Amino acid sequence: MLLSDLSSDQEATGSNSHGGGGGGDRMVVGSHGAAHVVLSNLFLPPAAAAAATMLLPAAPVMVRPAAMAAAQEPRAKKKRSLPGNPDPEAEVIALSPRALVATNRFVCEVCNKGFQRDQNLQLHRRGHNLPWKLRHRAAAVSAVTTAAPAPRKRVYVCPEPTCVHHDPARALGDLTGIKKHFSRKHGEKRWRCERCGKRYAVHSDWKAHVKNCGTREYRCDCGILFSRKDSLLTHRAFCDALAEESARLLAAANNSSSITTTTCNNSNISSNNNNNNINSISNSNNLLITSSSSSPPLFLPFSTTPAENPNPNQLLFLQQHQAAHHQLLLPQFQQPPSSPPAYFDHLAFGGGGGVITSSSCNDDNSSIAGDVMVAAGGDSVSFGLTSEGSVTMHAGDVGRRRLTRDFLGVDHDAGEVDELELDELPADLSTTAAACQGCNFAAATTVACCATDFTTGSRQYLGRLPPVNETWSHNF
């Protein structure tokens, strides 16, 4: 063959000249000890290629070692063992509380000095030139003499029955450890720090605390200094809660003050708007309404003027009074009361005449915001403006004189307006006042009124309320 000059190593491994390993398209066939290389199945006839594929060995399966598999698996975090898990073969020793807290368990017979451990006493005896002996460890004893049995390990249980270390399975393996445990958990705290006042039951704990107490300062945001961090944390738990409560109350106070300011501004704006609206309504409906005390009242009796009125004993004038009240102290309410016009002075005290006045009382205990009095000699009819925006009419002793109901706009008949006897007038007759949205500001507005001739029955209207129905408009 042409490729028979290949080396035996290359033939045995089945690798090509490019360094690639033996693949599925390359086969090494041995015959009588001689190796022959077939490059690829593509160069063989179909029958030979199928036979070569059947002769290929199976691919080797790599088995991962158990150590590598264990190393790659996530190792569970080892939990910390609970204190007091001794050897089952250890010797369990139960000491009394008096023996655990005793400071002079081992006493020197020379100086009567007490020690908690026997080892310390033996070392003390050396100073008195007395015989002493230290207890050797079990490992050292077993190494020297193999004949003597090794002493068992000792564990100590807590004498307190309710303690978890009272169980032998949870016994502590150190005598010093069981002594400190009993003193810390069940003993009296006899040592007190002079700086912070913290108390300790173990003297070594107290000494360690005194060395560091006062060397650091922990400052709260409120400015208080603490020498201990735990005191600062305890304080901040309450300080933060107090700060949040103070901030909430301050925010609520600010909101209430802003709402009050907005309400006052809205009241002033609404009062001005009400005055403007009332002026516009009076101009459109020929009402006698004035919002300024300095200007004289405007009379619009259809087509006549006050100078052309032939009867001087009808409605005389409108007069506005200011109510001296503690709540009406705004600048717009501090205008001086105006006097009636000069051309009505001769009619003010005329015989048989009527006077209409308006007043305001903004009293918290009263539901009437303003009233109107119609007086004719000794007879009177009063109209009250309530806070809900209605007009209440009260009839006095006016004899048999006559008033018309169309003054209030309550006549719903399409015919002629009926006249109502004053004696038959109900005590409280209320109707909604369309133009009385600003009832609290009645002192700044003159009430619309009409005039009636009480002697002859003839009527002369100086003004009227807004039309309530078609009858009101058609009757005039």
UniProtKB/Swiss-Prot annotation:
The UniProt record gives the binding positions of Zn(2+) 1 as: C193, C196, H209, C213
Record keyword Metal-binding present: yes
Q: Where is the sequence biased in composition, kind Polar residues?
A: 1-13
- Where is the motif (Nuclear localization signal 2)? 178-185
Residues that bind Zn(2+) 2, according to the entry? C220, C222, H235, C239
Cysteines paired by S-S bonds: none
What does the entry give for GO biological process?
long-day photoperiodism, flowering; positive regulation of DNA-templated transcription; regulation of timing of transition from vegetative to reproductive phase; short-day photoperiodism, flowering
Entry coiled-coil feature ranges: none
Mark the C2H2-type zinc finger spans by residue number: 106-128, 156-186, 191-214
Q: Which UniProt keywords apply?
A: Activator, Metal-binding, Nucleus, Repeat, Transcription, Transcription regulation, Zinc, Zinc-finger
Task: Cite the residue spans of the region called SHR-binding.
Answer: 228-240
- InterPro entries in the record, alphabetically? C2CH-3rd_BIRD-IDD, C2CH-4th_BIRD-IDD, C2H2-2nd_BIRD-IDD, IDD1-16, Znf_C2H2_sf, Znf_C2H2_type
Q: Where is this motif: Nuclear localization signal 1?
A: 124-131
Q: Which GO terms describe its molecular function?
A: DNA-binding transcription factor activity; sequence-specific DNA binding; zinc ion binding
Subcellular locations according to the entry:
Nucleus
Q: What residue intervals correspond to the zinc fingers (CCHC-type)?
A: 218-241
Tell me which PANTHER family the record gives: PROTEIN INDETERMINATE-DOMAIN 12 (PTHR10593:SF136), SERINE/THREONINE-PROTEIN KINASE RIO (PTHR10593)
What's this protein's function? Transcription activator that acts as a flowering master switch in both long and short days, independently of the circadian clock. Promotes flowering upstream of HD1 by up-regulating FTL1, FTL4, FTL5, FTL6, EHD1, HD3A and RFT1. Seems to repress FTL11 expression. May recognize the consensus motif 5'-TTTGTCGTAAT-3' in target gene promoters.
Q: What protein am I looking at?
A: Protein EARLY HEADING DATE 2
Whose protein is this, by species? Oryza sativa subsp. indica (Rice)
